[in-house]
């Protein structure tokens, strides 16, 4: 540990003092170094503390516990289905008398929505960061932040219009895929719809 006014000269000076940002990167490093000796697909369940160096925003924490379920080496829908079912099984045991909603998304579909709305391709990551706040600030808040970032009002209205009309079921996902067919392969939406239908057939859950 460094005392006040002491400064590290190189990265090596503080390499032993780092705090874990998330559980994903260490797992990726472990898998890359040991994949030849691991079962395929490789399944991992991790629970541990992670930290944020930046100043936390309201409602967020500098330190919190993260739980990750990962399946590596399986590119089929089975991995996604198994992970969602594992989550629902855990939630039912933790909260047996409480209803819950599982939220799923697909980055390819989110990108298709951004492209359809007319956002510049190199700006989609920034759009996603704002979209990620929707649970906290609502759809109107997302609209306001996008406009504050200087995006074209036409693109913002088109994008928030899509978000407002999405139906959170397999049929709604397929309908969205057809609407985005000019900028995205509808098969991407069909893939997510199939996952939702399969999970719904096994576990009685609601998607949000």
Regions found by a protein language model. Give the residues of each.
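Conserved small/polar residues in nucleotide/adenosyl-binding loops
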Residues: 1-5
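Positively charged, Gly/Ser-enriched RNA/tRNA-binding surfaces
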Residues: 7-14, 22-97, 143-208
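A general alpha-helix detector
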Residues: 26, 86, 109-113, 126, ...
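Short, surface-exposed recognition loops or helix-turn segments adjacent to catalytic cores
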Residues: 98-108, 127, 206-208
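Short, conserved secondary-structure transition motifs
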Residues: 103-117, 132-138
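A charged helix-plus-loop insertion that forms the helical arch/lid used to bind
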Residues: 121-131, 142-145
